Amino acid sequence: ECRRAEVLRGIAGKIPCIHFCSKETYFNALDDVISGLRRDGIDDIVILSLSTETDSIVSGAVKNGVYGEIRFMSCRKFKGLEADAVILVDFTERTVTDDAMLFYVGASRARIRLEIMTVMDNESCRNALERTEGACAGRRPMRDLASMLKCTALVHY
């Protein structure tokens, strides 16, 4: 335990968080995440889509590559760049089962904070976990998925 504390002492960020939303609560939750990051003094924020920019759940609210005042682009376009906070959107069952490398590219762009937004429910979390080698879906699939990703979980329904 002491050794773990020594290793973690130099890390400024928080444990990543996955936000489980419905389509109806998605934008309010996204706005809350952005407000929380700003409240914590983080202004270098980017929203990265695990899909394409045009297929993203937030595409209709994006104008000229910006959501509100926040930069928005695909993970592929942001490869090699960094931001203090990254909000990954369009996290789906496919991300877990087929796009792990793309997820890594997006997640590893965050210097301090990583927030993940998804509309996955218990059933889609269970399906993803069952298709992932070594993963097990218990009675609480959303929590189990968050645990597999080493994230905390927040539900916005």
Where in this protein do the model-derived segments appear?
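The feature marks helicase ATPase cores and/or their adjacent C-terminal helical subdomains
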Residues: 1-157
